Amino acid sequence: MQIIVLASGSKGNAIYIETENSKVLFDVGISLKTIKERLARQNVFLNQLDAIFISHEHTDHTKYIIPVMDKTNAKLFINQLSFDYLTPIIRDKIDTRRVCFIDKERKYLLNDIVVIPIELSHDSKNILGFLIKAENKNIGIVTDTGIVEKRYFSLLQKMHILFLESNHDVNMLLDSNRPWALKQRILSP
């Protein structure tokens, strides 16, 4: 198995996981050029992708859906609310026959990888984390979450690899165009 964190943070997120029979990208928040360059360093080529899983609709996770989908035959796995939010941007630019709607706590089998979306807490339409089972390993991807539900603690403790992505920049928050009530909630203890 090969796992490559291509980017993590407010400027863009993307994680690549490859097994013997599957090549999957989780989020596409960085440019096509950057994705291609970083994968090529490991002799991985974008046109080999089988699937793209999207955690939620924010641009640091979705900004480059269209160019990446254009360069692959990959299926796009996304929840309905995030897709609906993105529809004005991606309408007529993605073949909807390649879109698979996903729900929390359901298993999705892609060749030799099982992906189970889990519910997270974030200011988005419907954020999902991912529990992945591949090659006798358990991998968790938990990004942009304020709270992890207690019901997931035991599952996350069983992960061989757990990606937790979070950042908290007070100045960036205060300078943002978010509503004051939201800023206060985020800054609260």
Regions from the PLM with identified roles:
Residues 33-78:
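Active-site metal-binding motif and surrounding structural segment of the metallo-beta-lactamase
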Residues 1-42, 126-144:
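Conserved beta-strand hairpin/beta-sheet module of binuclear metal-dependent hydrolase folds
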Residues 150-189:
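Cap/insert and terminal regions of metallo-dependent hydrolase folds
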Residues 80-129, 133-136:
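Metallo-beta-lactamase
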